[in-house]
UniProtKB/Swiss-Prot annotation:
InterPro entries: AAA+_ATPase, ATP-dep_Clp_protease_ClpX, ATPase_AAA_core, Clp_ATPase_C, HslU, P-loop_NTPase. Pfam families: AAA, AAA_2. It comes from the Bacteria. It comes from Treponema denticola (strain ATCC 35405 / DSM 14222 / CIP 103919 / JCM 8153 / KCTC 15104). This is ATP-dependent protease ATPase subunit HslU. Keywords: ATP-binding, Chaperone, Cytoplasm, Nucleotide-binding.
Length: 485
């Protein structure tokens, strides 16, 4: 488990989220407390620990205000397995489409990949040494003393001596000469190997062609059991794996590649061979069960409005009912084993522009006791978004263009103008929140981005006049802004 989590207080969590997300303090506090409570639970005695379930969160707010970003940053901050899904992609069990249990299988796959990467990172130094030796073996066959020692030091066949066959032993002088010659050859090969080692490290042999043997994946064979409504892609993938095992598995193949490509292939194979896959599976399963986070977006789209007539909708109320046992706690079969969902944190989010949270079935509402309403963004918020976050849009575009030698400077007056225009367009058209800034920045810098390769060494100052020249006519023409911005 991630030990650093134990020292992350709610205040520290909010402070970290503030580096990337502007405003929405209520939502930040809610997720920070939820994260801290998980660490508190892990410190309790086992008999009490199992009784404490996470308090799932329902985020309510218009699009583009930071719902998804809060959950994503929280997962990165905690090092917990995180999965974002859209509620609209699932259908009721028994109908064509993905069943809701597949989100647990996907989360387990995320956890496995995360833990495997961490373990491989710890083994990377040794794997690099092994890879270097393997490359030298390919470039200079027979130059590895360790590998050739066994074959060069083989004794005479004992069976010949016991059968009475006369064996002519070489004279002492000829033996000494042979040993001297052998030692000379070994020294020469050793010197050549070291020269090649230096050249490898200096990347002077990257284009040289070598023949490598590509082995099939070293992963542990796994089986997965599916419910009746499982996705056909999952079933086909599982059947393909089973068929491969029954047929004796995938075969190794030889391929001519450059040293650069061979290094990547051998490195991946070394890491895969060195890592303990059973240990990875156990650790990943523990992390998913104790620290996993699933963010269910567009939950408002599966809320059936009370004024809506017609029969049951398999992608609405049925999906809510199928999610209930997973949120409450059930055991889901995956190819890595059975996963208990009791302590996975679920964060559901939706704009609820057409429906209301009360349109969700009562049982579903009860599984998400914490409700947080996110506020709509205004011009002042947009200004802060353009300037304050570590990954602010203005910083991103400036860094992108600087790769071509073009320096961009955004004046404060230009930032104010862009913020006002974003808020103005949002108020007149669909309110898409901070995502409007992406469109405005693209339109604003379109000419510079297109001609950047010919503007090396130039400095461009973005002021109010430039912003108005590029955007004012589009913003004022409501019909045009609806289609362009």
């Amino acid at each position: 488990m991630n030990e650093e989590l134990k020292d992350l207080t709610p205040k520290q969590t909010v402070a970290e989220l503030d580096k990337y997300i502007i405003g929405q303090n209520k939502a930040k506090r809610a997720v920070a407390i939820a994260l801290r409570n998980r660490m508190r639970r892990l410190k309790l005695p086992e008999e009490i620990r199992d009784e404490i379930a996470p308090k799932n969160i329902l985020m309510i707010g218009p699009t583009g205000v930071g719902k998804t970003e809060i959950a994503r940053r929280l997962a990165k901050l905690s090092g917990a397995p995180f999965l974002k899904v859209e509620a609209t992609k699932y259908t009721e069990v028994g109908y064509v489409g993905r069943d809701v249990e597949s989100m647990i299988r996907d989360l387990m796959a995320v956890g496995y990949t995360m833990v495997k990467s961490e373990m491989q990172e710890k083994l990377k130094e040794q794997a690099e040494k092994n890879t270097e030796e393997s490359l030298l073996d390919l470039l200079l066959p027979g130059s590895n003393k360790k590998k050739t020692a066994a074959t060069s030091a083989q004794p005479q066949d004992v069976s010949q001596a016991s059968s009475g066959t006369t064996i002519s032993l070489p004279s002492v002088s000829s033996t000494a000469q042979a040993e001297e010659h052998k030692a000379q050859n070994e020294n020469d090969m050793s010197g050549t190997r070291e020269k090649f080692r230096v050249m490898l490290r200096e990347n002077k042999l990257e284009d040289k062609m070598v023949e490598v043997t590509i082995s099939p994946s070293m992963g542990t064979p796994t089986f997965e059991f599916f419910a009746g409504g499982s996705n056909m892609e999952d079933i086909e993938s599982a059947m393909s794996n089973i068929s491969s095992m029954l047929m004796g598995g995938a075969k190794s193949k030889r391929k001519n590649v450059s040293v650069k490509e061979a290094r990547e292939i051998i490195m991946a194979e070394q890491l895969d061979r060195m890592v303990d896959h059973d240990k990875v599976t156990d650790e990943a399963k523990q992390r998913v069960e104790q620290m996993g986070i699933i963010f269910i977006d567009e939950i408002d789209k599966v809320a059936s409005r009370s004024d809506r007539g017609g029969g049951p909708d398999v992608s609405r109320e049925g999906v809510q009912r199928d999610i209930l046992p997973i949120v409450e706690g059930s055991k889901v079969s995956t190819k890595y084993g059975v996963v208990d969902t009791r302590h996975i944190l679920f964060i559901a989010a939706g704009a609820f522009s057409v429906s209301k949270p009360s349109d969700l079935i009562p049982e579903f509402q009860g599984r998400f006791p914490l409700r947080v309403e996110l506020e709509a963004l205004h011009a002042e918020d947009f200004k802060r978004i353009l300037l304050e976050p570590k990954n602010a849009l203005t910083k991103q575009y400036a860094e992108l263009l600087e790769t071509e030698g073009v320096k961009i400077e955004f004046l404060d007056e230009a930032i104010d103008r862009m913020s006002f225009l974003a808020a103005d367009v949002n108020s007149k058209n669909e309110n898409i929140g901070a995502r409007r800034l992406h469109t405005i920045m693209e339109m604003l810098l379109e000419d510079i981005s297109f001609n950047a390769s010919e503007m090396g060494g130039e400095t461009v100052k973005i002021d109010v006049a430039y912003v108005d020249e590029r955007l004012k006519d589009i913003v004022q023409d409501q019909d045009l802004s609806r289609y362009i911005l």
